[in-house]
Amino acid sequence: METSSNSSGSSSSPPSQHQQQQQQNSQLNLSSQSCFSNNSSSAADFNNYMESKLSEENNYYKNFNSNLDRGDSFKLEKESIKDTIKDNIKEDKICNDNNNSSSSSSSSSSGNNNNNIKDGRAPSPITTQQISPNKLILNTTKAITKPTPILNTQQTPTTTATTNTSTSTTNSTPSKFKKIKNSTINPTIEFISKPSLSVMFGFSPIYFVESIFIVLLIYILSNFVLKETSVYVISIFVIYFVIYFDNRYQIINKLSKSSINDSDSSSNNNNNNNNTTTTNNDSASTKGNNNNEISSPETYQKDVKSKINFYEHVNISSTNLNNVNTTSNTPITNPSNVNQPSNITTATTATTTSTNNNNNVNNSINNNNNNNNNNNNNNNNNNNNNNNNNNNNNNNNNNNNGNNNGNNNGNNNNILSKENSTNSLLNNLILNNTSVGKTHNRSSSGSDSIQPPPLPTGGSSHNIFYSAFPTHPYTDIDQSSTYRTRTFGSSSINNRKSLPPEYYNQYLNFLAHSNNNNNNNNSNTNNNNNNQSVSAPVSQLATPVYQTPGTNSVVGNLENDNENNNDSFSDINDNNSVVGNDFEQDDQILQNNGISTTTSTIVPTNDETKQELSQLENSNKVRSTVSKFIKLSTGVEEKLDWAIAQQCTLQPPRSSHSVTVYGSSLVLIGGEGITGENLVQFIDVERNLFISPKVTGGKVGPESIYNHDYCRIGNKFYLFGGYVAGKLSNKLYVLTIMDDSTVHWSSPRISGGCIPSPRYGHTFTRYGNRFLLFGGYDGEQCLNDLYILEPETMCWSTVTNIKGGQTPSERFGHTSTILGEKLIIFGGKGINNNNNNNNNNNNNNNNNNNNNNNNNNNNNKGLVELNDTHILLLNEIDSSFQWQVASFHQVSEIPSERSFHSATRVGRNIVMVGGKKDDSNGNPIALRDCWVLSYRMQWSKVSGVQFSPPRYNFGLIKNGSKLFILGGKGNNNNINNNSSSGGNNSSSSSGNSNTIITNTTNTTNNNNNNNNNNNNNNNNNNNNNNNNNNNNNNNNNNNNNNNNLSILDDIWFVNTVTLPISSSVTMINYSDIKIDKEIGKGHFSKVLKGNWKGKDVAVKKLNSNKDKAREEMIQEFKAEVELLGSLQHPNLVTCYGYSLNPMCIVMEFLPSGNLFELIHSKPSEQQQSIKLDSTLILAIAFDIARGMQHLHTRNIIHRDLKSSNLLMDKHFNIKIADLGIARETSFTQTMTTIGTVAWTAPEILRHESYNQKADVYSYAIVLYELLTGEEPYQGIPPMNAGILVASKGLRPELPDNCDPNWKKLVVWCWSEDPNKRPSFEEITNYLTKTF
C-alpha cells in the first residue's frame, strides 16, 4: 500500500487561486442542491440512511483496530484521512499574494462533516484524490488504496507534521488517559461551563465555585485588608463585579465560541519556510458526531456566511489606509490633493482639534454646549470645521443672557480639556490626510501587512490607547483584555480572541441610527477666516454614547459660568497636551460638544447586542454608587437639622469673638464692639442663663479684643493677636476662670526675642502642651509663617525643622484643626499660587476683556478666597514637621472658596460651617453650607435644615453631643437673596450664580466670562450692553447687601446623637420588627440586628432559664426594661421598647463598633492616621464620665464597665451599653462576682460588699487603655491576674512618658480603698479644670 507523494491523484504543484476558490465553494455549497432541496428525499429517509451508514462505519473500525498489527500502513491511512476530512471553511486559510504558494495550514473540525452531501445521496468515501492540495500535501512513501468512509468525529485529534521529504506519525490508538479524558473529564468541564443550565434552572456548578470564591474574598477583605470598611459595602462591590465579569464572559463565549477557537488553531500557521507546514490539531474543538442532527439549510447557510463575513475582515485590506474612504471603504484616487469631504470622518472622532501650527487656524467652541467642532487639517491653508449638533433644542434657547452663538477664538491650535484624555469617553484623534478604516479590521501577521499610522501622544504622563468602542469610563479595566481597547502594532493580535465584527456593526448601526434621529437642528459655526464649513452627518460617527444620571456639577478643571449653562472649557495646555485625567464627566464632554447623551428608543434585533447594551447602561450607574459608598464608608452623618434656640439670644450681639466650653456652660470672650463687663460672658443655653463674671486684674486685661484666636489648657485661656483697643496687637493675654462668677486677666512676660508680628485672621492651635501659630494679615501683606509657643516657659520659636513639602501660600481667615497627628488647614483669603488670576483659564484673544477680568479678579490687592487643604504632619518623637497637600477622591466634592468660616472637632471628623466670599466688586457674600471632613480625608456635604441667615466671623463649638453656632455677621433682612437652599454650595445676591464645586479651578465673574465668550458674535454690541447692565445691577445689589450686613445675636444648635423615638418604653409586637441577622451572642442572650419603624435597632433576645418560673422571669424582665427606659441620656444606649413573646429588648443600633475595637485594632498602612490623639481621648473620657454620673445619680451601678461595652455612634460619641446586669444600689451589696476580671474592682473579686466606687475602678482601667493602647495585664492569665489584683494590689503599669495630669487621675481612680476614689462628678470637674 505504498505510493509516491504524487500518486494521490493531485498535482504536485498547487492549483491556481481560481481552482482553490471553486473547491472551497463546492465544500460550502448549501444551495438548492443540498440534501434538503426540493429534488432530494425527505429528511427522515436521509437520517435512516445515515444511521445505517454510521453502524457500518463502526463495524469497519472495529475490524480496522483489530488489524493494526498488519503494519504501519493502516496507521498512516487513519492519520492522513483524519487530517484531510477535518473540514475548514473559507476563513481557515486566506493567504496574501506575497505569501509562499506552497504553504498550507491545518483545519479543525467542529463535528459536522457532511458538507459534501448532494442530491440526497450519501457521500462517497473520501480518498486522498478528493483532497485539495491546498488542504493537505501527502509527502509519503506509502500508498493508500482502500477508500475509507467518514471518520467518527469523536476520535481524539492528533498532531501531525508533514514535510517534503518525510512524515512523522504517532500511534492513533487512544491511551487510557485519553479515553478517560474523553469519557469523563471533557463532559464534566462542558457540563460545568454550560451557560444554558443557569438559564433553565437558575443554577449551575460553576456558580457554586463562584459563591465559594466570593465568600472567601469577602472574608479576606473584611478581616485583613479593609477592617474599617463595612462588610456590606465590600460584599456589594465583590458580588457586583464578579457577576458583571461572569456575564461578560458568557456573552463573549456565546458570540465567539464557534469562530474564535478555529481561528486560534490556524492563524499562526502561515509561515514563509520552504515547503514546511506544521499542523496542530490539539487545539481544535471536536464536539461529537453531529451527523444525526442536521440543521436546516437556511440556518446553516446563515452560520457559514457569518463566519465568512468575520474572517474576510481578519486580514487588513491591501489598500493603503491613507487612501481609504471610511464610509464606503473605497480607495481615494488622489489623497494628497483632495480636501476631505464631509463623508470622510474618523471612526472614533467625536471631539477633534486642529494640529496644524503652520496655518492660521481659529478653533471655535460653542459656549452653549450644542456644537461639536471637528477641525480636519489638510495640506492646504483652508480649514474644515465640522459641526455635529445632536440636540433637539434650538441653539438660541440655551443661553439665559441671549448669547446664542458665541465663539471663543484662541491662540492655541489644539484645544483639549482634562476630560478629553485617554480615559474619557471620546478619544481626540485626527491624522493629517489620513482616515482610519473600518473599526473591525485587524492587521495581518504576514510580512507585507500594512501597519496602521502611529497614534499622537497626549503628553508624557499619558499612554493613549486606541479605543474605538470605549464603553467603560473607568480605566481599571485592562487595556489589552478586549479588542476594543487594543493598541496599534500589538505583536499578539493573531493569538488574541475578539468579539465578532457583526456584533460591533449592529451596535454602531444602532447608535448611528439613534443619533441620526436627533440630528434635526444642525448648524454651521462661522470662522473669522472665512474657512469652509462642512456639516458631517451624525450617522458617520462611530463612537458610542452612553447616558449617565444628570448632574450640573463639574468635577475637574472646568468652570461653570452660568447656573443653567455649563458652556466653557477652562483649561488649555499651550503645548497641545492633555491637561488632566477626569473620567467622571464624560457625559459633560458629550454635552459640551453637541452630542446628545439621551439614548434612543430603537430596540436592536440582536439578543447579544441587547444584553451588552444593558451591561453598558448598568455600568454608568457605578459612578453614583461609588460616590455613595465612599460617603457611607467614612461613617459621616450626611444630614444635620439645625434648630434655633427660641428663648436664648446673645446679649449683646457678637461677631469675631471666641467661644469655648467650661463644664456645662459656654464661655464667650471678646467680639467686635464689645467692651467693659460684657467682654467675658458665661451662657447656659438650656436654662437661658447669662452671667457676666467678676473680673480681677482688669488693668492688665484688654479693653476690647476681636479677630483674635485662643488656646486652652484647663481653666486657662491663652489669647493672641487680633485688634486690641482698635489696633493690631501681638500681645499674649491669659484668662483664668477661678469659678462660675470670677475670672482673672494676666499678661505673662515673654522670654526670648522671637515674637510674631501683630496680625489678625491667624490660627492659634493647641497640640499636646504646645501652641502652633500660622498665617494672618499684618495690615499690609498676608503671612504664612509658623511659630510655636511653649506655655510653661512662655517662649516663642519659629519652626525651622520642616523636612519637606510645599508650604501653603500666604493667607488669613482660614481654619486650623488638629486631627490625630495632623494639623488640617483649609481655605482662607490670600494669594493663589496655582492660578494668580482666572485669565489663564480663558481662551480669548481680546485683550480688553482680559484686562477687565484681571481687574475684577484681582480686587482687594490681588487676594482671592481659597479652598485648598494643607496638612502639617506632626512628629512628637523628633519634633519635626512636614507639609503635604491633601488629595481627594475624584468623584468627591470639596467646599467652595471661602474665608472667615469656622471648624471644630466632632469625634474623629472635622465639621466646617459657613464663611464668606467676596464678589467681583469686593462685597462680601455670606455662606451657610455645612461640610464634614473625615479622618480618611474625605469631604462630605451635609444636608438637612440649615441655619439662617448665612454668616461669617461666628463662633462654633461642641458641648457634649450638641453643636452650637453663636452670633456672627450676616444679612438679617434679605435672607432669600443671600442664602442658598438644598444642595447649593454657596449663596449670592441677585444676579450672581451659585459657586460651583471644582477640584482645581477658581470661579470667575460669570457676566465677564459671558462677555469674553461673545466677541465673535454678530450681536456683540448688544451682548456687551446686556452684560454691562447685569454688572450694574449686581453692583447695586451687592452694595445693598453690604449695607444690610449686621452683627447677629441668634444661637443655633444641632444634636449629633440620635434622639429616642419616644420618651417612654412601650411594648412592641415582635412581628413588627424585621430581623436582619445575628450580630452577637452570649451566655444569657443573643443580639440581632433589625428594623423597626424605619430605624435600625438592636434586638437583645434573652435565653430561657429552666431554673426559674416563667412568671418570675417576666417580672424581672419588666423591671429591667422599666429601669432602662427611664435612663434617657446622650451617653447611654437608648431603649425603645420590649417584647414578651419572645422576651427581648429593642435598643438603638450603633454600627461604628465599640471602644475596645478602636483601641486595640492593629492599624494597617492606610490606618496610620486613626491613632487616638489627646483631643479625642479627652472627649471620650468626658462622655464616659457624664454617662456614669447620670447612672449614679439614679443610684444605679453598672458593674461591668469595660471598653467593649462602650459603643460609638457615627460621630464617636460614647454610648454606655450592656446595662442588663445593672442593679439599684440596695440590691447589690452582697452579690457575687459579676463582670470581666481585668476591669473588676478588687472588693468584688474578694466577694465583699461594694458600691458605686466599683465603677470608678473600672473607669480607671478604661483610661489606661486609652492612654497606652494596650490591654490590661497583657500576658497574664485572667485568673492569675484576678488573684493578684485581689490579694497583692496588682495594677497595670503606666509608661514614664504619660502625661502627669492623666497619671494622677488614673492612680486616683484605682485606689485600693474605695472611699479614696473620686466620684464621677469630681472626675468631670477635674477634666474640666485640668484639660
Curated annotation (Swiss-Prot):
Biological process, per Gene Ontology: signal transduction
Gene3D superfamilies membership: Kelch-type beta propeller, Phosphorylase Kinase, domain 1, Transferase(Phosphotransferase) domain 1
Region (Disordered): 1-43, 92-132, 150-175, 259-300, 320-419, 435-464, 512-581, 834-862, 976-1042
Catalytic activity: L-seryl-[protein] + ATP = O-phospho-L-seryl-[protein] + ADP + H(+); L-threonyl-[protein] + ATP = O-phospho-L-threonyl-[protein] + ADP + H(+)
EC class (word): transferase
Residue ranges annotated for the Protein kinase domain, each copy included: 1073-1331
Biased composition (Polar residues): 288-299, 436-450, 532-555
Major localization listed first in the record, in broad terms: membrane
Catalytic residues (positions): D1200 (proton acceptor)
Protein name, UniProt field: Probable serine/threonine-protein kinase DDB_G0272254
Family: Belongs to the protein kinase superfamily. TKL Ser/Thr protein kinase family.
Segments of skewed composition (Low complexity): 1-42, 96-116, 153-175, 259-287, 514-531, 557-577, 834-860
Record: residues binding ATP: I1079, G1080, K1081, G1082, H1083, F1084, S1085, K1086, V1087, K1100
Kelch repeats: 665-710, 716-769, 770-816, 822-868, 909-959, 962-1008
Enzyme Commission number, as recorded: 2.7.11.1
SUPFAM superfamilies xrefs: Kelch motif (SSF117281), Protein kinase-like (PK-like) (SSF56112)
A Pfam family: PK_Tyr_Ser-Thr
InterPro entries: Kelch-typ_b-propeller, Kinase-like_dom_sf, Prot_kinase_dom, Protein_kinase_ATP_BS, Ser-Thr/Tyr_kinase_cat_dom, Ser/Thr_kinase_AS, Ser/Thr_Kinases-Pseudokinases
Repeat keyword on record: yes
PANTHER family with a match to the protein in the record: SERINE/THREONINE-PROTEIN KINASE TNNI3K-RELATED (PTHR44329)
Species assigned in the record: Dictyostelium discoideum
GO molecular function: ATP binding; protein kinase activity; protein serine kinase activity; protein serine/threonine kinase activity
Keyword annotations of the record: ATP-binding, Kelch repeat, Kinase, Membrane, Nucleotide-binding, Repeat, Serine/threonine-protein kinase, Transferase, Transmembrane, Transmembrane helix
Residues that span the membrane, as ranges: 201-221, 224-244
GO cellular component: cytoplasm; membrane
Membrane topology value: Multi-pass membrane protein
